Amino acid sequence: DITSKFLIPEESKSSAYIICKEQNGAVLSGIDIARYIIEELGGSIEFNKIKNDSEDLNYFDKICTMSGSTQILLIMERIYLNFLQHMSGIATYTKKFSSIASEYNVKIADTRKTKPGLRKIEKYAVLCGGGFNHRFGLFDGILIKDNHIFAAGGIKEAIDKIRNRVPHQLKIEVEVKDWKELGEAIKSNADIIMLDNMELSMIKESVKVIRESLGSRCKIEVSGGISLASLEEICKTGIDIISVGAITHSAPAVDFSLEFE
């Protein structure tokens, strides 16, 4: 930070705080990462946390205070604010979905549509917003998608092959997009059926058919094109899970500001 080095003496000390500048409020995520950046990477900065991750924030709420080298506070400013803005943005956007879905006992889950290198913190931010984590990668859950179905020769063939090899504790989820695939998934006793990019009317009928055939043993997930506007009507259909890629890849950043005192 050549600007700070030219303007501010090395021995200068200051006190500062970070405030939320979202007029409609936000959900905090990333405060401990900010503390790590400041304390571990920034040298002898004293950091005091005021708010915790997952807490609701109001406009102008202070989330922490800091004191120490003026140069270090300014050099590190954009780094820790970027993490706070991004992670709190995900938590805040997730909360908008989860607060509606929870009224119907429906879980909002994330996807693998995350920024390269940031999946762990983005999925943590989803938890801060009341959401749930879907698979972290391709190693911790079985999800048979359209290309798997094509490669295996059909849903029944795919499920049979996996069932013969899968550890007993792993559930088998299959993605379906039409009536034919839904029928195959039901006949194959899939543990979880994902209804992919279906119209509301088809979701309703699909839920009815699944419940009549498999009862509540089979979990029903909906995915594809879910928005806040369509969310409540989808929740009313009796599904269990809605996976929303937008909560990680399209969440608006939350505005935070560093202020000196």
Question: Language model features by range: what are they?
Answer:
Residues 198:
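Glycine/alanine-rich phosphate-binding loops at beta-alpha junctions
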Residues 257-261:
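Active-site loop ensemble at the mouth of alpha/beta enzyme cores that anchors a bound cofactor
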Residues 1-188, 192, 201-209, 221, ...:
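Acidic/glycine-rich phosphate/pyrophosphate-binding loops and surrounding catalytic core
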Residues 224:
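Periplasmic-binding protein-like
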